[in-house]
């Protein structure tokens, strides 16, 4: 479960080990000196941040949004438009990506949170498709279905390894902030809303205000991920805002485990790796991916991280029970 544990000492050690494992893995990726690994790790970091931003809404607050791609795309187009039109340098354009993502969430959020459950989900989908339609048809400004190509970035970022370490630093800082938010009293209220919004409201907490805040924060981090994507690929298109992109990040979160903080990051890595590997060998890669995803969902019902934690916990419990029986 996301949030503080009942055993502070064990929880702190567990969190430290998680951070060390994640940082060590991504720090060692460039040692292979293969562009494939660096490119894949960059994709995982960006999509992992996007998935973790979404999970603040779904896994923490209990709000299933199909409109997350709107904020992701808004961040990407913010960077792309500002740089291609020569308005601002990259050092200013990238920080504006989360601002625009948050602003869009602040604009759409009050309308969406009036509803709950599947109605909230459908409303977020409708607004996201509206944003996508505007971007897709506005050729004079957004490039329409052609998107924006040749986004200029500082020359130092032309080397994939340099941009990788830059992305790693930004994502680590963003994830640390997300962690603090989840473990704060504010995060505890969000989890209370997920468990029982009526009871939370009965306690005098303005549920809609907290839900809107969660949407804005999630939109900001989604926008940041979109800005990083634009700088990495140096091109963007309207598919960034399509509902299928929201569906992809939902699948990543569920696959990795919505109850685990790092679960969405793991889910992003699994899905991107499977897509790349299978896509090299067959033109019917979507069918294979669908079958693999179905098997993973069946055998890992709580997500990869959640199921592994459950197995480890059961094994530890059996060992403790065995020791207690042997030494009464």
Residue ranges, per PLM feature:
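Extracellular/periplasmic helix-loop junction at the C-terminal end of a transmembrane helix
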Residues: 127-160, 166, 187, 234, ...
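Alpha-helical transmembrane segments within multi-pass membrane transporters and channels
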Residues: 86-129, 266-267
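Membrane-interfacial amphipathic/re-entrant helices at transmembrane-helix boundaries
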Residues: 1-49, 78, 87-93, 318, ...
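Helix-loop-helix "hairpin" substructures at the membrane interface of multi-pass membrane proteins
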Residues: 159-237
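Single transmembrane alpha-helix segments in multi-pass membrane proteins
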Residues: 26, 30, 34-86, 110-120, ...
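Generic structural signal for small/hydrophobic residues in well-ordered secondary structure
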Residues: 41, 65, 78, 105, ...
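Cytosolic-side transmembrane-helix boundaries in multi-pass membrane proteins
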Residues: 1-25, 195-197, 202-209, 278-328
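Transmembrane alpha-helical segments in multi-pass inner-membrane proteins
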Residues: 69, 94-95, 212-299
């Amino acid at each position: 479960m996301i949030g503080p544990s009942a055993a502070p000492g064990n929880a702190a050690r567990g969190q430290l080990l998680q951070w060390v494992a994640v940082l060590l893995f991504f720090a060692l990726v460039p040692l292979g000196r293969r562009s494939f690994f660096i490119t894949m790790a960059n994709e995982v970091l960006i999509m992992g941040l996007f998935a973790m931003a979404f999970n603040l809404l779904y896994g923490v607050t209990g709000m299933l949004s199909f409109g997350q791609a709107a904020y992701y795309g808004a961040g990407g187009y913010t960077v792309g438009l500002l740089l291609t039109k020569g308005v601002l340098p990259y050092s200013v354009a990238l920080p504006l990506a989360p601002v625009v993502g948050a602003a869009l969430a602040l604009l759409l959020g009050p309308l969406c949170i009036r509803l709950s459950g599947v109605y909230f989900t459908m409303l977020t989908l409708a607004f996201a498709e509206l944003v996508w339609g505007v971007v897709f048809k506005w050729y004079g400004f957004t490039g329409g279905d052609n998107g924006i190509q040749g986004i200029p970035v500082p020359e130092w970022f032309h080397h994939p390894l340099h941009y990788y370490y830059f992305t790693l630093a930004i994502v680590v800082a963003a994830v640390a902030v997300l962690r603090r938010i989840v473990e704060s009293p504010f995060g505890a209220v969000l989890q209370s809303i997920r468990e029982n919004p009526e009871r939370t409201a009965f306690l005098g907490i303005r549920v809609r205000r907290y839900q809107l805040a969660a949407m804005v924060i999630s939109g900001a981090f989604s926008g940041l991920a979109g800005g990083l994507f634009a700088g990495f690929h140096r091109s963007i298109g309207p598919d960034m805002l399509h509902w299928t992109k929201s569906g992809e990040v939902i699948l990543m979160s569920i696959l990795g485990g919505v109850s685990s903080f790092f679960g969405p990051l793991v889910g992003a890595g699994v899905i991107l790796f499977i897509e790349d590997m299978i896509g090299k060998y067959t033109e019917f890669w979507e069918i294979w991916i669908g079958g693999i995803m179905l098997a993973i969902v069946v055998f890992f019902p709580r997500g990869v991280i959640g199921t592994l934690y459950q197995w480890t916990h059961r094994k530890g419990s059996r060992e403790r029970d065995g020791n207690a029986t042997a030494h009464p």
